[in-house]
């Protein structure tokens, strides 16, 4: 077995308390936003995960001073950016390994009038367009050129960025973040309609306001931004990762464990707790903690007319697509059936063959839909050898392995390390 694999001996209950790390999706945004000022910015509750560490390395390469204050607190100062780093093979290699690098465009464009972007990496979960980023920035005055020999985009704003009205063609979290970061230093007023309003975007906007930006409508799908000349430094604490919290809930349910999730910021979880309760999972709320008591069985609810429950993803405040894989795997041991409808990505259900090999009863209807017939714990999943295709499916398979009888081996675990 290689070192890029987990060997899991499952079927054992877990117990105790666990505290989630800071939110990965927020971390990538606020790290890029530190480029908008020459002053120091201190970020706390920053998660120690592969994607964040790669972005920190990328910022160091750009000349950002990065000082680690504590295990999860960093001070960053972007007062001496090395634009020549864009021309190096190291930049193209490192930036292409992480999809979050796309959010470097806006702050560099806003401060220096130029930026570069190799084709970004990330999960292989279907088509993920960059059009929303490009069109939004183009309307603010950016010009994009593709350099085929380097496989990268060159972005310039020869006349500077100017505020305008933007109707986003899709609700994109990173697309909204990019446009917001460009607009805060653009001349004039920018209105962004159909903006993403996930807690990650709200947190980014609140941090920018602390830095001196003028943003109205935070938490809604209509943002109004009055450009300013410069931003100052600030201190910002990241929210706990709602995806990690949901993963822990699924882990507790599948392994019949009694687990308490500490400091979960329940007010920021939206409908996530309700969705798990619809799957029959009992949750006890104790202040800002969530206790998942040990359950021998859990039963999926039906709709009022008795029809099969459907769980589907949607932009916030809908159910996050990043927890659909977790929902699918916990359904395998529930009483009852559920239709899992992954609307936003077309390849995230392609790990179900591994669950079927473990003994799950799943019908893959098409790339977006799967029906799960729960085993009701009558037949325990069995351990197998498998590979992690992406972050969220990887954790779902890890949860399945922890609940399964016997030994499982999960390869390609760097995918899990990217987000956990």
Question: Positions of the model-derived regions?
Answer:
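Short, structured segments at the rim of ligand-binding sites
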Residues: 1-420
């Amino acid at each position: 077995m290689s070192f890029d694999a987990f060997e899991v001996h499952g079927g054992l209950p877990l117990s105790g308390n666990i505290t989630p790390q800071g939110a990965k999706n927020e971390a990538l945004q606020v790290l890029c936003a530190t480029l908008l000022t020459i002053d120091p910015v201190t970020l706390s509750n920053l998660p120690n995960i592969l994607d964040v560490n790669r972005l920190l390395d990328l910022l160091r390469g750009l000349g950002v001073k990065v000082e680690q204050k504590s295990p999860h607190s960093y001070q960053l100062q972007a007062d001496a950016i090395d634009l020549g780093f864009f021309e190096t093979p190291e930049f193209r290699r490192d930036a292409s390994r992480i999809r979050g690098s796309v959010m470097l465009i806006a702050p560099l464009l806003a401060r220096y009038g130029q930026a570069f972007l190799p084709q970004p990496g990330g999960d292989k979960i279907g088509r993920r367009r960059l059009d929303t980023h490009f069109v939004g920035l183009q309307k603010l005055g950016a010009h994009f050129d593709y350099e085929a020999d380097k496989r990268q985009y060159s972005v310039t704003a020869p006349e500077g960025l100017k505020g305008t009205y933007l109707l986003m063609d899709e609700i994109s979290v990173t697309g909204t973040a990019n446009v917001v970061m460009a607009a805060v230093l653009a001349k004039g007023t920018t209105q962004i309609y159909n903006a993403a309003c996930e807690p990650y975007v709200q947190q980014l906007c609140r941090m920018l306001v602390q830095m001196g930006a003028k943003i109205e409508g935070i938490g809604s799908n209509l943002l109004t931004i009055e450009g300013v000349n410069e931003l100052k430094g600030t201190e910002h604490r990241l929210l706990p990762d709602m995806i990690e919290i949901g993963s822990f809930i699924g882990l507790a349910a599948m392994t019949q464990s009694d687990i308490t999730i500490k400091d979960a910021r329940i007010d920021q979880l939206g409908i996530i707790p309700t969705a798990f309760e619809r799957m029959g999972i009992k949750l006890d709320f104790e202040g800002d903690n969530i206790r998942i008591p040990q359950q021998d069985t859990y039963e999926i609810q039906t709709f009022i007319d008795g029809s099969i429950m459907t769980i589907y993803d949607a932009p916030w405040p809908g159910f996050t697509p990043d927890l659909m894989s977790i929902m699918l795997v916990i359904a395998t041991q529930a009483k009852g059936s559920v239709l899992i409808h992954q609307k936003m990505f077309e390849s995230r259900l392609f790990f179900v063959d591994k669950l079927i090999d473990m003994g799950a009863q799943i019908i893959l209807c098409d790339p977006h839909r799967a029906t799960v017939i729960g085993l009701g714990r009558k037949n325990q999943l069995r351990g197998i050898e498998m590979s992690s295709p992406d972050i969220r499916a990887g954790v779902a398979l890890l949860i399945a392995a922890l609940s399964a009888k016997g030994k499982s081996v999960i390869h390609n675990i760097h995918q899990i390390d990217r987000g956990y």
